[in-house]
Amino acid sequence: MKSITFHPKALAFIRSQSPTIKREIGEALRDVQKGISLGLPLSRPMPTVASGVHELRVRSATTVVRVFYFVKVADTIVVFHGFQKKTQKTPAQEIAVGQQRLQEVLHGHD
């Protein structure tokens, strides 16, 4: 089973969510750890962030949450950005923050 590494801000974001959202994120990441390939509607590739990045898509009755994760690191899943989605298209600002945080995690800076 793959290990998971979190950017500190992504972990704080996930911890701030409702119990329902946290449970769904946790269950989906556990499946990814086991090597299960998630597909739509739960996850989709996000090549606009970087090659190998996927967007976990979680919804409750009142909230839509997205979490970016990267799986092309040997035996590790990198969870590096999360945000509440309020528009149909992923905002450019969220993509830019995701790109920056991925580099921070991959190169050992927080």
Predicted regions and their residues:
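Basic, Lys/Arg-enriched alpha-helical interface segments
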Residues: 1-64, 73-77, 84-110
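Conserved Hanks-type protein kinase catalytic core
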Residues: 70
